[in-house]
Amino acid sequence: MLSSLLITQFIYGTISTIIYSLTVVFLTKNWKHFDNYFLKLYICQFFFNMWMYWNFYITSRLPASTCKDCYLSGWFDSLSKDSGSMFPFKFFIFCQYHLGFMSYSNLFLTSINRFTLIFMPKRYFQIWHYGTYILIALIFITPILFTYPLLVHQAYLEYNPLSDTYVARTQADLPFLYSFILVWMVVTVLLSIIANIICWFKISKYSKAARQQSDYRLFLVSFVTFVINCGVFSIAMLNKISADIDPSKLLLSSRIAQLLSPFANDLLSLSTPYVLIIFSKRIRQSIKNLFIKGTVAPSSITPLQNIPASRI
């Protein structure tokens, strides 16, 4: 049972994945011209954003669109609680929650990256030369302190006869995990708000010429991505509140949050390349050349430090 929603999400998800991949290909092929730690974080973010987006199809979207007589029902029945399947379904459940932690951690890390560039430009390269991969490793490892029960306990799919679809279940203590995710989201978002507000006050005093420079444009990329993350966070919080006080979804705000919820995580995972393309004329032109010429000649790219400010 392929719903129109699932088809729509698959189409824009595939298109966004291609565009996201093209930006990464361009940055990788011309790495020496864009040797910037912000862009390294961008490429790292690409991997776990894509992982999170397509992983969600296995844990939620496909099961929620499959009826008892549908093509995938046989596979999903084999993932039931008592089936004894060898398919590592609990690993995909683990990834879904683990990557949720990582998304908000990366939001904070990107905000700190811009903060150090704006307020500590002389020490920026020293800090991120030694700290980039250490911080990325911490983002990846730290959530395991909270998400490891998902790897220990069984996860399975359960058929719901009322909706005629399948639902993912786990024997791990999800309320306990949700409480940690909520605290993690609140703390990282609040710290990101503080960092971005301080940066905004500083950068708003830049001259018109300075606002054409790369650090200003990359700050805008970070800031817009931060605003998008705040929007997704607001939807998540509204869903949590409505689940507690309005489980029947009688209030308009509850219904709006429920309607937006399927697209919120997609916005979190897929918006980054569009923001970068909007604010980077260089990358925008290079993506265009990839479609028209099929490649980007390295000689056509000027090293970042030699690019006129208006062309970055």
From Swiss-Prot:
One Pfam family named in its UniProt record: Srg
PANTHER family in the record: SERPENTINE RECEPTOR CLASS GAMMA (PTHR31552), SERPENTINE RECEPTOR CLASS GAMMA-31 (PTHR31552:SF26)
Keywords: Membrane, Transmembrane, Transmembrane helix
Disulfide links within the chain: none
One GO term (biological process): sensory perception of chemical stimulus
GO MF, one example: transmembrane signaling receptor activity
Native species: Caenorhabditis elegans
Transmembrane feature ranges: 6-26, 38-58, 92-112, 132-152, 180-200, 218-238, 259-279
Chief place where the protein resides: membrane
Compartments it resides in: Membrane
Gene3D superfamilies tied to this protein: Rhodopsin 7-helix transmembrane proteins
Entry similarity comment: Belongs to the nematode receptor-like protein srg family.
Membrane topology designation: Multi-pass membrane protein
Cellular component, GO annotation: membrane
Protein name per UniProt: Serpentine receptor class gamma-31
Coiled-coil regions listed in the entry: none
